[in-house]
């Protein structure tokens, strides 16, 4: 049955298709529009299609349409399994629906089943030949056959201004036919730039808009193309104005339309018709001084074609399209041969192209033509004079030798005529390396001499914007005039980005970057900054949506660069390689070149790893080459990390980081970042220690702003990681010491606050943890990490209703994020909904897997200030105990494998979810266990010797979502002690055989028929039943010793084990059989009297406290017991013990612990004998032992094991004991026989002698398990122990079978 919350989240997902229709349409064209129409009023076009497909639309047809729309929504979200389920449901209702057939073909195409898609295409042609549905499926199949490198080449030609060649390249992709829907807009935009083709481009865009009026991207392109021609410019303005109204449904297009509208206004002449449009713009934008100046031109004056051409030229120059820029400037020069700006522009084009002589001539002509603006060109001309020197400086900067470059520039600035140019370059360099103070002084020095220098004005404005001094920065920018409007907007955007970089509030950061996106929607660097901010906020799905245009359809080299950085940063090497293939090596930035080198290193190493069994030599070989940036070491380590081989990942980083004594800053940051990826914050911190605060005082060289930002983020991550590690070990005090610097450095940062909450959780102060989590969540309700933490804290604190409400809000808010469903799983588990918990976990697993594929593509109370303010002192130092560690199955580590990266291995969240699913599935599944065990105990045959065989059969029924269980056990048990030796020493020491011997001796005829049989053998057989209930803190059982034994007993017990923070208190009371011998366990019958005796039970009361100190577990406890039996002397016992064990080695595959145990117990009576009235169990009056146990556990593949060995020393003392302690008459008779020594009877005394023993003690206990299948596990165990006056060994083979795997 579908849960209500799942249905509501699905509806919310469908509703989202309307809210983000503009973004989805860019990627999927008309098909996404069909999915969105589920929530929008039907247009006339939709109604006509509906009439064609279903003339009388019944209720069933409406359901089919809804299911198909759901499928399209899921396909847009890359949720193909959900899409398949929706399509299957629709097919059961209307298998021949043409709408369904088109959607099925789309689904088959998306999952790569092209043959099936082609078959569906043929069926669709037969059902509805020539229909829109057939056309859409044909277009989709054609698009997916297009060569991505060829498409990237066409886009590159268009971006560089070679429109003619770009159009030819596009037409080659389309085989000369009509462009496919997803590429039609960009094709017609490119075609509009070809001479004489503007009309054709307009017609094509008009057809697109008519076919799909909600395609905002096509609407925008049409409006822009119309403004390029004077005859259609007013119509274009009207369309641009209309598009600005779609801020909610198409924010990117609306923002671009506003920018284009303003640009078009500057192209219009000032006439009575245009003046109201300009005035209306000024009313809304009173600070637009450039438009105000334009309006001051004489009314009715003709448009300045030269100015338009110059604007186009500088715009193309700024975009790097040199051919287009040269053509535009030449066009302006043809209109006016003395146009200084056009001449200067041509000079800049020549400089960019490396034609220095030509550039020098153009720049001199520009100064001569317009002396008033000579200052615009003198810096460039001055730079030409010393071009080689400046070239060498640029090469130094490109290679990272910024200090030497600064010295060169300072020298240049002292040369005649070079002060301004060299100082400008120096200031720019200082600004880029974070020396903002020095850069500001140099910019101001230039402006003091030349107040109109545009480069200095813009450089100083960038510095001031970065420091938050917006007022002065805006005042400087206002002095630039209209020709620098694009640069001004870029600087304004950079100011917003700088403000976003300064804040640690993730919500504010996202808000600022979204604001910047409205100003520069095409800026790829702004887009990747927003995506990164969203990821830091926890909204990876939205981050992927923001980056999707760049990842799927990059157009410019900058688009490719940003997309490559994002793909690589998210571990998607496949996507990064594909994007690299579409980018010319000439357009590689240093960062992109580093990524390309990493990809090449990984590819080469991966191909060779498949041919070796031991990768160590290959690791050393791969790292033998120089690694100045750290890229090589990171690439090798990252390859192994992605494969889950952390051993060789650590090895690679260790080799790389120790090859040179003096590592560069770049190397340290690179290696430390990779160390953090493989969860080694200690090594990362050690690498970063020499960098100090990043000012250069520790290393001698200042770090760039980006490097300082990376250093700050790494240090915060290290503090949080080390705190979490110590918290897991139970040492919250030391954890807080590591976390405190991060809390103090940035009190607004979210991750240290959540880490502090985890410390309080670890200490058991769930209420305080909840207060912190809720305070973070109130500040940013979108923070899924905070929400997940709050759900867990509420559940820990017993506030199940609050946990459920928080979890449901998270699912409703972010239904496509795995963390929302992990929170839901915690809430459902807290209220005992096991099936729902399992469904939540599986949903989280699917979503996380898909995310990796995409990126690899009660009222809430409490005072927020108190909750989030870091305490002034360490609140965890007051207590000297920590969080108890479990000695259960160790965490796994995958060893080296030549296989490719497995998501479950390489992603920590996915691995954790998989483990939870596996554990919960087992906890919730009824199970049956069956085994065969043997036990052998030393001693005299017929008395202390014991051989036991048992066949335990266990049935388990889970309760309360697997947190509790009811267990039923039946154990057939067989005991034997062997034949009593027929000697004069042994016979009288069992039962009442002493008197039988005496009677036999007195029987004068001594005939066999009058003799009493003393040749006894102890045998018992029976079945032991037991019923047990257990949960996390209490267990209780009731049962019996084997029914069928001579003297069965009712047994059982109860244990309470509440946990208060990291301390566990155990209190138990139980009644158990003493299984030392056949006598104590099952009871026996005396041959002479026929009386039964034995069957001893101990009634034991015990208390114990367990805690941890870091990796060390300590415990202490004691108890009291009363032993009773049938015709056996009652006894009492006191006992106590202390111990500790510590972790000495652990990786993800093995664990070793070493400990020490001190044991004491003592009984009132010594009853370790077998005459009538004795109990037959080891019961010294004092026993001391000190042992050292060593435990080794681990797993590999389908095997797991757990072995413990111990050795130590024991001292014990036993008092003497009467032969017949419960019968004075028997004892008196025995006293009378004391001293007899014959072949038939040897009795020195009627009391057993006492003893004092000191000896070694030790043993082992081991288990090996093998998982045959998901439902069946086999275990083989064995043990041996030497203690007291006995040795005991045993073995068992058992099977565990899940009856019903949930």
UniProtKB/Swiss-Prot annotation:
InterPro entries for the chain: BCSC_C (IPR008410), Cell_synth_C (IPR003921), TPR-like_helical_dom_sf (IPR011990), TPR_rpt (IPR019734)
Q: Membrane: present as a keyword of the record? A: yes
Q: According to its UniProt record, where is this protein located?
A: Cell outer membrane
Q: Which UniProt keywords apply?
A: c-di-GMP, Cell outer membrane, Cellulose biosynthesis, Membrane, Repeat, Signal, TPR repeat
Task: List the Gene3D superfamilies hit by this protein, alphabetically.
Answer: Tetratricopeptide repeat domain
* Record's protein name: Cellulose synthase operon protein C
Give the PANTHER family listed for this entry: CELL DIVISION CYCLE 16,23,27, CELL DIVISION CYCLE PROTEIN 27 HOMOLOG
Its function, per the record, reads: Required for maximal bacterial cellulose synthesis. It may be involved in the formation of a membrane complex for extrusion of the cellulose product.
The similarity annotation says:
Belongs to the AcsC/BcsC family.
Q: In which pathway does it act?
A: Glycan metabolism; bacterial cellulose biosynthesis
């Amino acid at each position: 049955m579908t849960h209500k919350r799942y249905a509501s989240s699905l509806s919310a997902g469908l509703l989202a298709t309307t809210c983000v229709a503009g973004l989805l349409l860019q990627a999927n064209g008309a098909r996404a529009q069909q999915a969105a129409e589920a929530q929008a009023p039907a247009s006339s076009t939709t109604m006509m299609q509906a009439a064609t497909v279903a003339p009388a639309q019944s209720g069933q047809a409406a359901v089919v349409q809804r299911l198909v729309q759901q499928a399209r929504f899921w396909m847009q979200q890359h949720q193909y399994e959900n899409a398949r389920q929706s399509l299957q449901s629709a097919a059961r209702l209307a298998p021949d629906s043409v709408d369904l057939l088109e959607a099925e073909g789309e689904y088959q195409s998306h999952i790569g089943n092209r043959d099936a898609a082609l078959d569906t295409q043929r069926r669709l042609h037969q059902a509805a030949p020539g229909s829109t549905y057939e056309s859409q499926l044909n277009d989709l199949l054609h698009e997916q056959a297009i060569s991505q490198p060829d498409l990237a080449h066409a886009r590159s030609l268009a971006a560089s201004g070679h429109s003619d060649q770009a159009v030819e390249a596009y037409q080659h992709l389309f085989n000369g036919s009509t462009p496919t829907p997803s590429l039609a807009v960009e094709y017609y935009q490119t075609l509009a730039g070809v001479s004489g083709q503007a009309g054709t481009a307009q017609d094509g865009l008009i057809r697109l808009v008519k076919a799909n009026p909600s395609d905002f991207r096509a609407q925008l392109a049409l409006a822009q193309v119309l403004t390029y021609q004077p005859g259609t410019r007013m119509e274009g303005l009207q369309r641009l104005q209309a598009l600005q109204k779609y801020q909610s449904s198409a924010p990117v297009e609306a923002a671009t339309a506003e920018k284009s509208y303003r640009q078009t206004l500057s192209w219009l002449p000032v006439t009575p018709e245009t003046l109201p449009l300009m005035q209306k713009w000024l009313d809304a934008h009173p600070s637009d001084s450039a438009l105000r100046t334009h309006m001051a031109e004489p009314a009715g004056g003709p448009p300045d074609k030269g100015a338009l051409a110059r604007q186009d030229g500088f715009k193309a120059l700024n975009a790097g399209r040199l051919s287009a820029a040269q053509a535009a400037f030449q066009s302006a020069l043809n209109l006016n041969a003395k146009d200084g700006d056009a001449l200067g522009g041509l000079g800049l084009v020549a400089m960019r192209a490396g034609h220095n002589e030509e550039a020098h001539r153009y720049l001199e002509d520009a100064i001569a033509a317009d002396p008033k603006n000579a200052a615009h060109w003198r810096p460039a001309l001055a730079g030409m004079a010393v071009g080689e020197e400046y070239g060498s400086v640029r090469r130094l900067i490109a290679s990272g030798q910024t200090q030497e470059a600064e010295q060169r520039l300072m020298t240049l600035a002292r040369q005649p005529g070079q002060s301004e140019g060299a100082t400008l370059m120096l200031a720019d360099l200082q600004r880029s390396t974070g020396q903002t103070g020095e850069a500001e002084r140099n910019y101001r020095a230039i402006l003091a001499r030349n107040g109109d220098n545009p480069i200095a004005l813009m450089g100083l404005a960038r510095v001031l914007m970065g420091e938050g001094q917006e007022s002065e920065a805006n005042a400087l920018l206002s002095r630039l005039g209209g020709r620098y409007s694009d640069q001004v907007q870029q600087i304004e955007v950079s100011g917003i980005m700088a403000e976003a970089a300064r804040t640690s509030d993730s919500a504010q950061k996202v808000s600022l970057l979204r604001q910047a996106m409205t100003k520069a929607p095409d800026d790829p660097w702004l887009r990747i900054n927003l995506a990164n901010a969203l990821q830091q906020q926890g909204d990876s799905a939205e981050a992927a949506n923001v980056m999707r245009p760049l990842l799927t359809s990059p157009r410019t080299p900058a688009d490719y660069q940003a997309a490559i950085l994002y793909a690589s940063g998210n571990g998607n090497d496949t996507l990064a390689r594909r994007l690299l293939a579409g980018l010319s090596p000439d357009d590689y930035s240093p960062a992109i070149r580093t990524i390309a080198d990493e990809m090449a290193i990984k590819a080469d190493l991966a191909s060779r790893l498949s041919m070796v069994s031991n990768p160590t030599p290959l690791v050393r070989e791969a790292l033998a080459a120089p690694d100045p940036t750290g890229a090589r070491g990171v690439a090798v380590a990252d390859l192994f990390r992605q494969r889950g081989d952390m051993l060789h990942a650590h090895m690679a980083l260790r080799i790389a980081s120790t090859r040179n004594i003096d590592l560069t800053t770049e190397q340290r940051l690179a290696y430390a970042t990779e160390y953090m990826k493989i969860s080694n914050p200690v090594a990362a911190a050690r690498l970063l220690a020499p960098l100090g605060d990043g000012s250069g005082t520790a290393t001698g060289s200042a770090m760039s702003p980006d490097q300082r930002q990376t250093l700050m983020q790494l240090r915060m991550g290290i503090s949080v990681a080390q705190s979490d590690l110590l918290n897991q070990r139970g040492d919250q005090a030391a954890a807080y010491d590591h976390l405190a610097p991060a809390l103090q450095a940035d009190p607004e940062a979210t991750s240290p606050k959540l880490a502090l909450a985890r410390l309080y959780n670890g200490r058991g102060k769930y209420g305080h943890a909840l207060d912190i989590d809720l305070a973070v969540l109130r500040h940013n309700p979108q923070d899924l990490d905070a929400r997940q933490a709050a759900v867990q804290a509420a559940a820990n604190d017993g506030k199940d209703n609050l946990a459920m409400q928080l979890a449901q809000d998270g699912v409703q808010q972010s239904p496509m994020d795995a963390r929302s469903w992990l929170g839901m799983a915690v809430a459902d588990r807290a209220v005992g909904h096991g099936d729902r918990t399992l469904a939540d976990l599986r949903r989280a697993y699917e979503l996380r897997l898909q995310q990796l594929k995409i990126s690899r593509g009660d009222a809430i109370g409490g005072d927020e200030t108190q909750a989030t303010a870091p305490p002034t002192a360490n609140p965890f130092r007051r207590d000297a105990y920590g969080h108890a560690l479990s000695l259960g199955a160790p965490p796994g580590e995958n060893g080296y494998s030549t296989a490719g990266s497995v998501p479950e291995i390489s992603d920590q969240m996915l691995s954790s979810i998989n483990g939870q699913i596996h554990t919960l599935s087992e906890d919730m599944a009824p199970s049956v266990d069956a085994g065969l065990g043997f036990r052998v105990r030393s001693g005299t045959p017929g008395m202390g010797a014991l051989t036991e065989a048992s066949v335990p059969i266990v049935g388990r029924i889970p309760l309360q979502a697997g947190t509790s269980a009811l267990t039923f056990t039946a154990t057939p048990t067989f005991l034997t002690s062997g034949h009593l030796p027929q000697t004069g020493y042994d016979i009288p020491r069992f039962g009442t055989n002493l008197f039988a011997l005496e009677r036999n001796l007195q029987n004068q005829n001594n005939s066999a028929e009058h003799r009493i049989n003393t040749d006894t053998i102890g045998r018992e057989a029976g079945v032991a039943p037991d019923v047990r209930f257990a949960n996390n803190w209490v267990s209780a059982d009731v049962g019996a010793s084997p029914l069928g034994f001579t003297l069965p007993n009712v047994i059982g017990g109860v244990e309470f084990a509440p946990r208060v923070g990291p301390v566990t208190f155990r209190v138990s009371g139980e009644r158990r059989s003493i299984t030392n011998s056949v006598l104590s366990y099952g009871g026996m019958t005396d041959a002479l009297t026929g009386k039964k005796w034995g069957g001893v039970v101990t009634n034991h009361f015990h208390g114990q406290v367990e805690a941890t100190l870091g990796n060390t577990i300590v415990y202490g406890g004691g108890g009291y017991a009363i032993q009773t039996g049938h015709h056996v002397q009652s006894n009492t016992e006191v006992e106590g013990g202390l111990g500790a064990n510590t972790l000495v080695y652990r990786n993800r595959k093995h664990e070793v612990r070493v400990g020490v145990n001190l044991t004491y117990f003592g009984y009132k009576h010594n009853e370790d004998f077998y005459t009538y009235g004795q109990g037959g169990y080891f019961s010294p009056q004092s026993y001391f032992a000190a042992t050292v146990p060593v435990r080794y556990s681990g797993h590999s593949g389908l095997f797991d094991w757990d072995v413990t060995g111990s050795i130590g020393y024991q001292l014990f003392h036993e008092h003497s004991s009467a032969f017949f302690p419960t019968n004075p008459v028997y004892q008196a008779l025995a006293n009378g026989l004391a001293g007899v020594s014959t072949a038939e009877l040897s009795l020195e005394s009627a009391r057993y002698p006492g003893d004092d023993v000191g000896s070694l003690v030790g043993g082992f206990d081991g288990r090996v398990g093998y998982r045959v299948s998901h439902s069946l596990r086999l275990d083989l165990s064995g043990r041996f122990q030497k203690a007291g006056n006995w040795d005991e060994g045993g073995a068992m083979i058992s099977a565990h079978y899940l009856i019903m795997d949930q």
